[in-house]
Amino acid sequence: MIDRDPIDVFNNTLVPMVVEQTNRGERSYDIYSRLLKERIIFLTGQVHDGVASLICAQLLFLESENPSKDISFYINSPGGVVTSGMAIYDTMQYIRSPVSTVCIGQAASMGSLLLCAGEAGKRYATPNARIMIHQPSGGFQGQAADIEIQAREILALRERLNRIYVKHTGQPLETIERAMDRDNYMTAEESRAFGLTDSVIERRALSDDGDTKSSS
C-alpha cells in the first residue's frame, strides 16, 4: 500500500464544499476557492515548492483582477524551505496589490518572515498566535569542498534573511542577529513590540456599509 501525503488526503477528503446560487443555478466551490473570490489566501503547513507555486499564482491572479485592492493572506505555518518562502516573499513585494498578513496559530521560521513582509500597518496576529524567528539551518554531506560551498551558501542566506527582517521590523541589524541566534518564540503582543506585526486583533468590526474589516 502506497503512503499518501497527509496534506493531499486533507485537501481531497476534508476540505468542505460550499454551494452558491447564481443566475445560472447552483455552483459549488471548495472553501478555499470560494474565499479566493473574496481575495483571501491561506498558507497552512510546511512551506515547499508546491505550496509556493500555488500561493504565487493566487497573488498574481488577484493582482490581475484588481491591482489596487487589498489581498488578505492568512498564515498558519511552521516554516519550511527557505527558497520556496523567498519565492512567495518576492511575489508579495512584486505585485501592486497591498497584501495584509494575519497570523493564526503560528508563524515560525519562513512563516514569520512572510508575516512581517505584509503591507506596513496591515500585519496582524490573533491573541493566541505564536511567532518564532531563528537563523536558517541545514545538514550537509559529501566531500569537504562540497560542505564548504554549502556552508558559504547558508551563511549568505542568513545574512539575506537578517536584512529582510531589518527592512520590515525597523530593528537594527545587531538586534536581529541576536534575536535569531536561536529559536526565539514570541506572543502576539511581543511580535508587535518587536515590529513583526502592527496589531493584535480579537475580532473584526463592522464598517459603516456593513462590510467587515480588521480592527486593532
From Swiss-Prot:
Origin species: Rhodospirillum rubrum (strain ATCC 11170 / ATH 1.1.1 / DSM 467 / LMG 4362 / NCIMB 8255 / S1)
Similarity comment text for this entry: Belongs to the peptidase S14 family.
GO molecular function: ATP-dependent peptidase activity; ATPase binding; serine-type endopeptidase activity
Keywords: Cytoplasm, Hydrolase, Protease, Serine protease
Top enzyme class: hydrolase
Quaternary structure and partners: Fourteen ClpP subunits assemble into 2 heptameric rings which stack back to back to give a disk-like structure with a central cavity, resembling the structure of eukaryotic proteasomes.
Record-annotated disulphide pairs: none
Compartments, as annotated in UniProt: Cytoplasm
Any GO CC annotation of this UniProt entry: cytoplasm
Official protein name in the record: ATP-dependent Clp protease proteolytic subunit
